[in-house]
Amino acid sequence: MKTHRIVLVAAGLAALALTAPAFGRSAHSSAATVVTTKKYSFGTILVTSSGQTLYLDAADKPGHPACKGGCLSVWPALKTSGAPKAAGSAKASLLGTAKIAGGVKQVTYDGHQLYTFASDTKSSPTSGEGISGFYVLSATGAKITSTTKKPKPSESGY
């Protein structure tokens, strides 16, 4: 599993070099970090105010992120220097912060530390879903583990 994660991190770093400017803004520190929502075919998910999809890392423990070092180049932590704010369907009562390395505050939602994915682009905004244990979150704070819709039964009788 660790080797798989390292390979994915390396692949993500390569993709980062090509796609980092895609959103024109990273998920770095902001005095008024805003968490909002956006609708996709698999549900309403959390995004930044600039539209970047937010993810949780299933391997995180409260206050102890599993993603460190090079992993953070691929999965940047959503940081804040002030109190995070909710917009859209996001709930202010579920927002919080966790102190990470260097005393930096990482935004949390329903206890989950939030990350963006460096390889997401405007044309593929949820490409990190399911990679290495990272998942998008619903407005209730639940992880969404599948972004594919189930096909409807055929009406042709076959």
What are these regions (language model features)?
Residues 2-9, 16, 21-158:
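Compact beta-sheet-dominated domain cores in extracellular/mature segments
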